[in-house]
Amino acid sequence: MTVNGKDIDSPNAQYVAAGIDMSDLFPAPFPTNVKTVHLETLSLAKLLQRDEDELRRIYENCKDPGFFQLDLTDDEQGVQLLQDAVDCARLMKQLLPNMSVEEKRMYKQHSRVGVYSKGYQVYDVLPNGQPKYNETVNFPMTEMLGYGDSTVDLPDWLSPHRELFQRTMRSGNKIANIVLAALEVGLQVPRGALTDAHRIQDPSDDFLRLLRYPGLQPGQPRDDLCFPAHKDFTSLGILFTWLGGLQLLASASAPGVTSGTMTGPLDIAEDAWRWVQPVPGTAIVNVGNALEILTNKALTSGLHRVVRAPGEQLPFDRYSVLVGTRPANSFPMKPLQSPQISPVLDPAAAEIATMTSGQWGTHNIGSFNNWVKARTERQEVLIIP
């Protein structure tokens, strides 16, 4: 196979999609002896065409399990986002392992508490200076695109790539709104009920997040849990990843599962978890808590976690690109009116219904900080057989 004038040998041909060679992001094959979850693959082109069967399928998959794979290769808008995500991952692969944490921390987080949409972030650092679990680089969409009251000053190691980050954000917001418009049909809400809450020009806590999960090195203490089980504080997440690590539950009714948004690493039995195998050319899309709230649980925000890569992939760094979409900060967090959405609110939902999206996000991130601190104090360690 020849891609852009370069010969691609047959083993790597499986990592080529829409003419984009991603073989460098797949340094080892996904193992064949682990239990995986089946996610439906939906077509971006068919969603744009308002194909009735595809509209039904996306609604059913967002009801349960709240995850699906979106084929981006059949529409030029999707191919653009795919290429931008690959470019972002390659950039982080070039930069992050070769810089000190002190250098990377020069990209400061937001001064306001409760928002993880800006800056470099790492929780635990090993004696060799490398992150123990993961490191993230976050870009706030509103400020990056010039829609807010302030702009983002990027450090020297990021500023030459501002246009790439901006392009990825714009493409991601377009794709998210295609998904939201499709869900409006299944939910039987007026056109614009969801998309008007997620307009790119309205101030929000939308973000682009670039992640690196360092591979396990010889002699390093084994702890397989990179990020404990949780639900996302978004409306939609659009995730690109190339190595294994993301896990979902085989059943939402597994022992230990609660209605909460977070849980400890040892609360749910190991055999309840299933691996997600990345598929070249697709993005993994998930419903977040905001969409679950706006539909009063007609749509499901699925519990998931991130662990170290399986099998031969274990020693390799894993990179991910995540576009997070949230309602505008001023949007009320009360359920939409529809025959598909129950008007009866439980006490927690009734309290949230008095908040704006911005207030709700700040409240949730504060709880998340306490959860992370408690996990560290308990010194919980997970080792997957």
UniProtKB/Swiss-Prot annotation:
InterPro entries: IPNS-like_FE2OG_OXY, IPNS-like_sf, Iron_ascorbate_oxido_reductase, Oxoglu/Fe-dep_dioxygenase_dom. Fe cation binds at H230, D232, H304. Residues 203-327 form the Fe2OG dioxygenase domain. Keywords: Dioxygenase, Iron, Metal-binding, Oxidoreductase. Disulfide bonds: none annotated. Pfam families: 2OG-FeII_Oxy (PF03171). This is 2-oxoglutarate-dependent dioxygenase AFUA_1G01000. It comes from Aspergillus fumigatus (strain ATCC MYA-4609 / CBS 101355 / FGSC A1100 / Af293).
